[in-house]
Structure formats: structure tokens, C-alpha cells
């Protein structure tokens, strides 16, 4: 009997010990999970706190969220935020804190373009994106004088500095062959359309002035031309528009029987005989160029020019093209087509996206250095951070992104 009681006591002792072990293990596990959950919340909050320190100027003026700082500065901020919360917690040993914006720096223009499009979509739904007012109305008192960027340090630090330029004239000439694709430029909601709305809202152009202080007057022209002066960018866009209009106008001349007959009569009068054919070609080119030159003047003065013309929207007769118009703009009888900003949209729509985004970032940097912070650099800005933390020998890793 005593032997049985002894065996039962031993068995109960074993069971009790096992239960105590399980209980202690559960208590330890709950404690570790509590620490893990608490650490997760603290580090997440610290990361969000870093993102909350976005550049207020860029957000207010351009709708973009950027954080500034190198890895050392960001890691220091993260450590400060974590230790502020954990400093009095004896059960938390913070062993490593690291934050890096390396994967999110705006050297990658795709990241910037992604955020621009996200902002444009939101702003469009809220009806916040509108074209800048025309320089002839709200803009006269705000319009800047023509400027040239001459600061060597500012020039070499531009985001587009290392991107090879592309020929804007060739781009414009190629658009003349895209008659069936022009409607795509103005299709609401497309990526190209959203980029155009963003650009026309936030940046000046020759005919319109955006809100806020800006270094260049011809900013949209800068996005297209990439030159360092207002005058040169205006000239590059002027050449591009004429290059677009010339083949379209030449095609109309040859498609219009009345104009073909006028060419024939004039060429026979100037060079009768075999040379008349060559003269006719030269006259047609002269006429098309004169009309193209007048088209650009019309656009600058606020008139509209159709992509493909008819007799009613044609402005210059053959005599006027040959004699020259002494700088006078000829307004056609029929007003229809696209205005200057819509022609800018055509060029922007077919422009290389990487180059376009880089030049948008150029302008943000130029304007920030001009009126906000003379040391501002896009190359020091990012749209997110990677976080690596070790607490109590456990690793925690996060990605935080706007």
C-alpha cells in the first residue's frame, strides 16, 4: 500500500513539474510575443515619424512627398525616435538601428513619376488641377523676366545633367505623321494626359503663369528643350512647332486644287518651261514655311491652329508668302483647332518619359534653391526608407514609402 502511495506521489510530482514547465514556457512565450509586438509597433511608429518630416516646400508647391537626408542622418533620427520610447524599458535591448533611403532616391526617375501620377490622379478627382492663368490676364504682374541659369554648381547637380538630350525637332516632325494618334493626347485619365495636367498646372509657359515663385518663365518649354535660358527654350519649341506644322501645311497645299493651280500659274510666270516644276516645288515649300511661321505667331497670340487645315483655316496666300509679311500675323477667317498649350501637350505626350520626369525634378530643384533653400538637392531626396533594427537579438526589417 505504501509502495502504491509512493508511486502516485512520484507520478503527481512529475505531472506537476511538467505543468509548471509548460506554464513557464507559455509565460516566456507570451512575454517574448509581447516584446516582439511592442517592438514592431515602436519601430513602425518611428519609421512613420521619419516620413512625417517630408519637405514642406516641395509638398506645398508641387504636391510631392520627399524626405531629405543621408543614411547616417536618417539612422540617427530613427534611433532617437526608438530610444525615446524604449529608454525606460529594461526588457528591451536595442542593439542596432539602421535607416537607408538608397533604394528610394530620386536618381530613379520612375519613383518620381509614380508619385507625380498618384498625386495627379488624386488632384484630378478633387478638381485641384487647372491650367495656369494666361499671362495676358492674371499673369502680367507675376510674369518673370527672361532668365538664364549660370551657376555651375547648380547646373551640374541637375537630375537631368547626365541624361543625353534628344532632338526635339525630330520628335515634332514624327508627330506630324501621327494624325490618327492626336486624340490620344487628350484622352482623360491616361498616363500621358495626367502628366500633362500636372505640368500645365504647376509650371509656367510662354503664355501662362503658375502660382508661386519660379526662376524660369518658360518652364514647360524647359521640360521640352532642356536649355538653360528662357530665350533658348522658347526658340527650341518654336523650331519644333514649325517642324511639326511644315509637312502638314505642305500636304494641304498639294491636296487643295486651288492652291496647286496657284503654284502652277506662279511657277510658269517665274520660270516658263522645264524649270517650272522645280520652281513649283520651291514655291510650295516657301508657302508652307510661311504658313508655319504664321501658325506659331497665332499660337503665341492666343489663337488656335487646327492640326490639319482646310481652306477656311488657311491664313496666307501665295503672294503674301513670296513677298513676306513684315512680321504681321495673319488671322484666318475660321478660328478652330488647338491652342498653344495644347500643342505643348502634343510634344509632351510623345516625349521620353524618363527625360520628362528628370526635367520636372530639375525645375523643382531650381525653384527650391531660388526661393527656399540654396542648398536643396534632389539627389539627397527620397520617397521612402528601408529600416533594419535588432532588439533582444531579434531582427526587424521594414519598408516605408510614401
Give residue spans per PLM region.
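Long, compositionally biased low-complexity segments
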Residues: 63-402
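Alpha-helical assembly-interface signal, strongest on the long, hydrophobic N-terminal helix that forms
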Residues: 2-76
Amino acid at each position: 500500500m505504501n509502495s502504491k502511495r509512493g508511486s502516485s506521489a512520484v507520478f503527481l510530482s512529475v505531472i506537476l513539474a511538467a505543468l509548471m514547465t509548460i506554464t513557464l514556457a507559455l509565460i516566456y512565450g507570451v512575454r517574448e510575443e509581447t516584446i516582439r509586438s511592442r517592438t514592431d509597433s515602436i519601430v513602425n511608429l518611428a519609421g512613420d515619424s521619419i516620413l512625417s518630416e517630408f519637405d514642406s516646400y516641395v509638398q506645398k508647391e508641387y504636391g510631392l512627398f520627399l524626405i531629405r537626408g543621408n543614411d547616417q542622418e536618417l539612422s540617427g533620427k530613427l534611433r532617437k525616435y526608438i530610444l525615446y520610447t524604449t529608454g525606460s524599458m529594461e526588457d528591451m535591448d536595442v542593439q542596432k538601428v539602421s535607416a537607408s533611403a538608397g533604394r528610394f532616391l530620386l536618381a530613379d526617375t520612375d519613383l518620381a513619376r509614380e508619385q507625380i501620377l498618384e498625386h495627379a490622379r488624386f488632384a484630378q478627382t478633387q478638381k485641384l488641377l487647372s491650367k495656369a492663368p494666361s499671362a495676358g490676364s492674371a499673369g502680367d504682374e507675376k510674369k518673370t523676366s527672361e532668365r538664364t541659369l549660370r551657376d555651375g554648381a547648380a547646373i551640374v547637380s541637375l537630375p537631368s545633367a547626365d541624361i543625353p538630350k534628344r532632338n526635339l525637332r525630330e520628335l515634332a516632325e514624327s508627330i506630324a505623321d501621327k494624325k490618327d494618334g492626336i486624340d490620344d493626347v487628350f484622352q482623360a485619365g491616361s498616363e500621358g494626359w495626367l502628366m500633362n495636367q500636372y505640368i500645365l498646372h504647376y509650371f509656367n509657359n510662354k503664355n501662362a503663369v503658375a502660382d508661386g515663385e519660379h526662376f524660369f518663365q518658360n518652364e514647360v518649354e524647359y521640360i521640352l528643350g532642356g536649355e538653360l535660358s528662357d530665350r533658348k527654350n522658347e526658340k527650341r519649341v518654336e523650331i519644333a512647332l514649325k517642324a511639326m506644322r511644315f509637312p502638314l501645311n505642305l500636304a494641304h497645299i498639294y491636296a487643295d486644287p486651288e492652291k496647286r493651280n496657284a503654284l502652277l500659274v506662279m511657277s510658269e510666270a517665274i520660270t516658263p518651261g522645264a524649270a517650272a516644276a522645280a520652281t513649283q516645288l520651291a514655291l510650295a515649300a516657301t508657302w508652307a514655311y510661311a504658313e508655319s511661321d504664321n501658325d506659331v505667331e497665332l499660337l503665341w497670340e492666343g489663337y488656335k491652329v487646327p492640326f490639319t487645315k482646310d481652306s477656311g483655316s488657311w491664313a496666307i496666300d501665295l503672294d503674301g508668302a513670296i513677298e513676306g509679311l513684315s512680321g504681321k500675323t495673319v488671322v484666318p477667317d475660321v478660328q478652330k483647332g488647338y491652342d498653344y498649350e495644347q500643342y505643348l501637350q502634343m510634344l509632351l505626350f510623345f516625349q521620353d518619359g524618363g527625360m520628362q520626369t528628370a526635367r520636372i525634378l530639375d525645375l523643382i530643384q531650381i525653384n527650391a534653391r531660388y526661393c527656399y533653400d540654396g542648398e536643396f538637392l534632389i539627389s539627397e531626396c527620397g520617397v521612402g526608407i528601408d529600416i533594419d533594427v535588432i532588439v533582444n537579438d531579434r531582427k526587424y526589417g521594414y519598408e516605408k514609402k510614401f
